[in-house]
Swiss-Prot record:
Keywords: Collagen degradation, Hydrolase, Metal-binding, Metalloprotease, Protease, Secreted, Signal, Zinc, Zymogen
Binding-site residues, Zn(2+): H434, H438
Primary location: secreted
Annotated catalysed reactions: Digestion of native collagen in the triple helical region at Xaa-|-Gly bonds. With synthetic peptides, a preference is shown for Gly at P3 and P1', Pro and Ala at P2 and P2', and hydroxyproline, Ala or Arg at P3'
Enzyme class per UniProt: hydrolase
Protein name: Microbial collagenase
Family matches, as PANTHER family: COLLAGENASE (PTHR13062), MICROBIAL COLLAGENASE (PTHR13062:SF9)
Function text: Possesses gelatinolytic activity.
A GO MF term: zinc ion binding
Cofactor: record remark: Binds 1 zinc ion.
Signal peptide annotation: 1-27
Superkingdom, taxonomy of origin: Bacteria
Tagged with keyword Zinc: yes
Length: 807
């Protein structure tokens, strides 16, 4: 939802939530962290920075919390930001300065959050930033729609979730919603700025100050329902996410311990279900309402046959079924029989490769009955987000998910859920090979369930890194480019948990797996012998030993690593050197050409990383044609793509891939005269986005339903929920929370419990708040009913195992 697109509607991926903004330089500034530490005027240096600075700000080390990210430094930045807001008159340069200051503040909070046991910034500092945000939203230019102006608005409204001060800013942010109309909705970047209200509402779940505020301001629930009803027209536009999130986050308020807030939110969800019934055009709102009610107020769904509703929806949304000759059964929304057969071929090839690489002997681990795997493929990310969670219980802020279930259960259904990132003749199924590798790895390499695999840590690097390796082999450019940003030791990578960031989990995991497979295959054989027999404690011990043993070798190996494309003949790694006859074409600048029939003029254009749009067009008189190739000179007789027609008006557009960006590199083009042509304008249009700053990892807020004696693995970044139904005859429930990460983990997850409502750090009946993430509760029980649990990470989160026992 970060793309600026006009009507008519073209659905946007819900995962794309951050800004895509111009990569053009704002100023030649010295803005990396080391330079800022030496700057005599920090606020001025930040204000004049360019977009390229953001990545360094967000990836800064925790040492910066003692200098440029200290509370004193941020206090001075707050003063500068407030002054910039007070003098803001809607000019682009002013807006850029505000956005820079805002992103710097967000980066500081991000670094502090990821630093572990470091004191939080004070509430007073957060309140000062909140007052600055309110002052900005009160400015008559706050909601201007220029590119830079929208950037400023988005940065400050997104900051609310960083500083956790929504009770102070919600009135102003609710007021901004009133500017949403059919005209402003055309700018989805601007709409995404309004959507930061709902991001903040989700980020304030279990926040006691927020719940107290809402208990005294329940009119906001009425206003959000009215907003959604009044703007139902937007459900047929690219701005539909704003209406959807208004209702979804209203539903999440059911988790409030305040009875009046909960009751009002439940009533709104029930009205949503009546207005948008399952099977209607916008039934994803019905699904959102059912999701919230089933999580936080299941009693409100009494009488609704959810299993039948799921069967009906699955039959409508995934009507196609194709059985592969191997273990896969493909259910899809829009794959043709030919495409489904091609997917089977891809999976079969990957399976053969897997058995060779992992040396499995094609022998499953003991007690694994997952002989088949269901592959559910949605047509696009929108359908994946709309329907998959309801149908299969997966999270949707990802590129697909493998759901192993209980492999020891003969009636279990192993499944991975995926979606297509394009709907042409190609398969375009995101992470198809990655997720299928998870199935194969679990069946042939990992004894027991997912929780069993994670019970002693030191395994995430393999689970995700091996799946990435099987997909990319030696061609994972993004992972290799990551090395230049700073090396990790092998021991560090081996200690990775799911509470770490995606670069560490997937890309560094890939590098560790590739290193071990290439340099120490016998050690890998030894590790897999342990995991196949369920010896995960011994696995963890051996991995720690190997990390210490090979740290130095791994560092040297990284120095010599290069990308090897899988098909070098068809996708050359090095572009053809331009000859004297090939001229560089500058992006976004037109040149005028004239030529005779059969004449040819050759050009090349370099497309940088983070390009969101790339097209080349000719327009003029006569009859010229356009031909193009990637990384090799294009001619009218030797080219990769052309859209030639009669006349001299042609355009070639290059689609973004699954990452959202056009493939970077050198593109060659030929303008050839089929007849004489004159006054033909040649233009290469390139739009780039600033590298998206990282955001705090998001929790799955769906409560986990526990069973007595069955351990559950939970990754907690900030907040998770769990519940257990206690039957008659139980007098005590005992709950253990165990840290699954390495011994030097700085994570801290606290455990809260209540009988009547979802607990918070302030409103609960029972609590365990020992240092670290090992917690224990013994709760007396007098009658049957639910126990509700909240797992809260006040600073750095953790991977934990949760288990309950009835006595």
């Amino acid at each position: 939802m970060s793309h600026l697109l006009p009507f008519p509607r073209r659905r946007l991926a819900l995962a794309c939530l951050l800004a895509s903004i111009s990569g053009a330089s704002f100023g030649q500034t010295q803005c990396d962290v080391a330079q800022l530490q030496q700057s005599p005027d920090l606020a001025t240096a930040i204000s004049s920075a360019d977009y390229a600075c953001y990545s360094g700000w967000f990836s800064a080390s925790s040492d910066t919390l003692n200098n440029i990210y200290s509370e004193a430094s941020l206090s001075r930045v707050q003063v500068a930001l407030h002054q910039a807001v007070q003098t803001y008159q809607g000019e682009a340069e002013q807006a850029r300065a505000i956005e820079n200051l805002g992103e710097y503040v967000r980066a500081a909070y991000y670094v502090r959050y990821n630093a572990g046991n470091v004191a939080a910034f004070s509430d007073l500092l957060g309140q000062q930033f909140a007052h600055t945000i309110n002052a900005f939203l009160a400015n008559p230019h706050a909601l201007d729609q220029g590119r830079e102006q929208v950037g400023a608005m988005k940065s400050l409204t997104l900051m609310v979730d960083n500083i956790k001060q929504l009770p102070l800013t919600m009135d102003a942010m609710m007021l901004a919603l009133q500017q949403f109309n059919p005209e402003t909705a055309k700018n989805t970047q601007w709409v995404d700025g309004l959507n930061n209200l709902f991001r903040s509402m989700a980020g304030h779940i279990a926040n006691d100050a927020f719940y107290r505020y809402l208990a005294s301001n329940t009119q906001h629930i009425d206003m959000l329902e009215k907003f959604a009803n009044d703007n139902a027209w937007a459900l047929d536009t690219d701005a539909d996410f704003l209406v959807f999130n208004a209702l979804r986050e209203t539903g999440r308020l059911i988790a409030s311990p305040d009875k009046a807030t909960k009751q009002k939110a439940v009533q709104v969800m029930q009205r949503v279900m009546a207005r948008y019934p399952l099977g209607s055009e916008h039934d994803k709102l019905w699904l959102a309402a059912v999701e919230m009610l089933s999580y936080f107020a299941p009693e409100a769904l009494n009488g609704l046959d959810l299993p039948q509703a799921k069967r009906d929806l699955a039959a409508r949304v995934l009507p196609n079924r194709h059985e592969c000759q191997g273990p896969a059964i493909i259910r899809s929304q829009d794959l043709t029989p030919e495409q489904a057969a091609k997917a089977c071929d891809v999976l079969a090839a990957k399976e053969a490769d897997f058995h060779q690489v992992a040396n499995t002997g094609m022998q499953p681990v003991a007690d694994d009955h997952n002989q088949r795997v269901e592959v559910a493929v949605f047509a696009n990310n929108d359908s994946y987000v709309d329907y998959s969670a309801f149908l299969f219980g997966n999270t949707t802020d990802n590129g697909g998910q493998y759901l192993e279930g209980n492999p020891a259960d003969e009636h279990n259904t192993a499944r991975f859920v995926a979606y297509r990132y394009a709907n042409g003749e190609e398969l375009s199924i995101l992470n198809l090979e990655h997720e299928y590798t998870h199935y194969l790895d679990a069946r042939f390499n990992q004894y027991g369930s997912f929780s069993d695999n994670l019970a002693h840590g030191y395994v995430v690097w393999w689970l995700e890194g091996f799946a990435e390796y099987m997909h990319y082999k030696q061609g994972y450019q993004a992972a290799i480019e990551l090395i230049a940003q700073g090396k990790m030791s092998l021991s560090q990578v081996f200690a990775t948990s799911y509470s770490h960031d995606t670069n560490r989990i997937y890309r560094w995991g890939y590098l560790a797996v590739r290193f071990m497979l290439e340099n120490h295959p016998q050690e890998v054989e030894g590790l897999l012998a342990l995991s196949r027999s369920g010896q995960f404690e011994q696995w963890a011990q051996q991995v720690q030993t190997l990390g210490q043993q090979y740290d130095g070798e791994f560092a040297r190996w990284l120095d010599g690593l290069e990308v090897t494309p899988e098909n070098p003949d068809t996708d050359p790694d090095t572009p053809t050197e331009p000859s004297d006859g090939v001229t560089q074409l500058q992006a976004n600048q037109s040149i005028t050409l004239s030529g005779k029939a059969y004449s040819e003029k050759l050009f090349y254009v370099d497309v940088p990383a983070n390009t969101t749009h790339f097209s080349v067009a000719i327009e003029g008189d006569g009859d010229a044609d356009l031909y193009m190739s990637y990384n090799q000179v294009a001619h009218y007789y030797d080219f990769e793509v052309s859209k030639f027609v009669d006349g001299s008006n042609e355009e070639i557009q290059f689609a973004a891939d699954a990452s959202g960006y056009v493939k970077p590199g050198r593109y060659y083009l030929s303008v050839t005269g089929r007849g004489r042509y004159q006054a033909v304008n040649l233009t290469a249009t390139i739009d780039t986005a600033a590298p998206t700053p990282p955001t705090q990892e998001q929790d799955d807020l769906a409560p986990v339903m526990l069973q007595s004696g069955q351990a559950q693995h939970l990754t907690v970044h900030q907040q998770r929920y769990a519940a257990v139904y206690v039957p008659e005859g139980v007098s005590e429930v005992r709950i253990w929370l165990s840290d699954l990460t390495s011994s030097d983990s700085q994570g801290n997850v606290n455990l809260y419990a209540s009988r009547e409502h979802w607990p918070t750090p302030e409103q609960h009946q029972f609590a365990s708040r020992y240092a670290g993430s090992n917690q224990y509760l013994a709760i007396p029980v007098e009658q049957a009913g639910y126990l509700h649990f909240s797992l809260n990470a006040p600073q750095q989160g953790d991977d934990v195992e949760m288990v309950v026992y009835f006595h």
